[in-house]
């Protein structure tokens, strides 16, 4: 009985929040946090990211080991530079409304109003692509009216009538601030997205907030950082930071419903049906059945499940049993069959 099944989850209404994107009710099921130091050198050009702390909470923690879910979200939430001529999003290149080569021919601009944005008087400049089916944004530019004509804020929306694979709607908001030496720098970046895991199923909502602070234009011993191999470095203690660390170092507090995620997960795990759903989803996504409840302990997994049962006209129904060892048995040698 559907009503009897849903009654087991009636406590969920206490954890509902409202989407900042479209105002619809949402349930926070995953929170990921990352605290990093970003280094940039203009000449020779180099970029390095040192991850000081990172953690992941939510139902997807058991479903994802940095694979499909993580890689897809990272592709969506790549930081952009509004001042570049082209902005890459999901393997597509969008013309920037500030492009020095195409902006004035690619977009139509409309002065909407003058208003205060974070203490700066700005002109509200709307823009739309000249061709509604092209890879351009709709949105707003807020330009300061103090004589410098700096970009204070920008809103970018992807048009509804273009194909972005499994993404339905995407919005990017950036705000800039002026430093004491008059330099303008990126202050905050918000990305909102509605997307599907499977087309035709319930949409998912994701929101990423990036906060930029503690700018330093005279970094000591920067050569030692740029001498590191690779662009990304995760400190050994990054994933082991306690709650107290996040409380003191998180630049913006979690929202009430985000902070209540641990309580929500505790309630959900008391419902046997939820655990069965998660276990089934884990098997479907990974293709393997672990021989232990904890992924950090299991030494052998059965699978892949998509080849366990098969049938054809010549051989009829067939069943095979297979599996493979994990890094918990030996991190260097693996066996499968």
Where are these regions (language model features)?
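Structured extracytoplasmic
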Residues: 1-124, 128-136, 194, 198-310
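Short, hydrophobic/aromatic-rich segments at coil-to-beta transitions
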Residues: 118-126, 150-155, 183-188, 331-335
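Transmembrane beta-strand segments that form the barrel wall of outer-membrane beta-barrel proteins
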Residues: 127, 155-159, 300-311, 321-322, ...
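Mid-length scaffold segments of soluble, non-membrane domains
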Residues: 133-145
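Outer-membrane beta-barrel channels and translocator barrels
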Residues: 146, 179-181, 328-330
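Short aromatic loop motif centered on NTY/YTY
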Residues: 158-159, 164-209
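Residues that define the transmembrane beta-barrel architecture of outer-membrane proteins
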Residues: 170, 315-319
């Amino acid at each position: 009985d559907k009503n009897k099944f849903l009654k087991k989850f009636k406590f969920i209404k206490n954890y509902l929040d409202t989407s900042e994107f479209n105002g619809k009710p949402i349930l926070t099921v995953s929170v990921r946090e990352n605290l990093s130091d970003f280094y940039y050198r203009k000449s020779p050009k180099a970029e390095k990211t040192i991850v000081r702390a990172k953690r992941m909470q939510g139902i997807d923690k058991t479903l994802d080991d940095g694979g499909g879910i993580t890689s897809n979200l990272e592709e969506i939430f790549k930081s952009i530079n509004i001042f570049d001529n082209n902005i890459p999003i999901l393997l597509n290149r969008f013309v920037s409304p500030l492009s020095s080569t195409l902006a004035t021919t690619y977009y139509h601009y409309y002065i909407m109003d003058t208003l205060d944005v974070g203490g700066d008087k700005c002109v509200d400049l709307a823009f739309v692509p000249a061709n509604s089916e092209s890879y351009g944004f709709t949105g707003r530019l807020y330009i300061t009216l103090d004589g410098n004509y700096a970009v204070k804020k920008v809103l970018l929306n992807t048009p509804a009538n273009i194909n972005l694979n499994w993404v339905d709607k995407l919005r990017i908001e950036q705000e800039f601030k002026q430093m004491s030496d008059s330099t303008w720098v990126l202050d905050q970046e918000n990305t909102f997205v509605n997307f599907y895991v499977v087309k035709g199923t319930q949409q998912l909502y994701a929101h990423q907030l990036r906060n930029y602070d503690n700018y330093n234009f005279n970094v000591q011993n920067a050569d030692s950082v740029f001498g590191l191999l690779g662009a990304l470095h995760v400190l050994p203690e990054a994933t082991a930071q306690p709650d107290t660390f996040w409380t003191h170092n998180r630049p913006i507090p979690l929202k009430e419903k985000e902070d209540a995620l641990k309580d929500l997960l505790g309630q959900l795990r008391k419902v046997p049906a939820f655990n069965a759903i998660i276990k089934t989803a884990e098997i479907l996504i990974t293709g393997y059945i672990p021989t232990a409840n904890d992924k950090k302990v299991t030494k052998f997994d059965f699978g892949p499940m998509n080849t366990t049962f098969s049938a054809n006209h010549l051989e009829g129904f067939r069943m095979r049993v297979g599996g493979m060892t994990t890094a918990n048995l030996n991190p260097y040698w693996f066996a499968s069959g």
